[in-house]
Amino acid sequence: MVIANPIYDVVFKRLMENDKVAKFFIGTLLEQTIETIEVKPQEFTYVDELAGLAVFRLDFIATIKTENGERKKVLIEIQKARNQIDLMRFRNYLAEQYKKEDSINDEKIILPITTIYILGFKLPEIETPCLKVDRNYKDLVNSKTLTTKSDFVDKLTHDCFIVQVNRITDRYQTRLDKLLSIFEQTNFVDDKK
């Protein structure tokens, strides 16, 4: 039996078209229950003028509402190979998303952003298959962490999740392990045999 590999954009798009799967995927990574979700694949063509190439890309934007009523925009990016040009593309794409207003019930608002990067390569200095980089509010004058949040600050900064596909193992102990197992690459066939 051949199973479609979710690290490929079209396969991941198909998975994310299912609300239940999309809620499970995003909710498991964010460690939150997702009440509502609206996923929109963002299709665009990236032109590398130096190489003379046009590359078709699919990125995913999900607008979610958590069980506590918080709304946020989740950007999901799949990157199969490590490339310096892609790092700049990530940054430009993120900047474009920060510039866009969101619409909830025909009301224009600015949502906080969370990013999820699914990488098909290893970051040599980070050994975990799944990494969370989150915002903490720290009072530098009194050297203590604050629990109070600011809507203004939350909309200027973002949490980030990184999945390193090549570091995923066959460990199935937690809900996150089970989620990551769908990306584990030893079960997939490619043309490199």
Residue ranges, per PLM feature:
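Elongated, amphipathic alpha-helical interaction scaffolds
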Residues: M1-K193
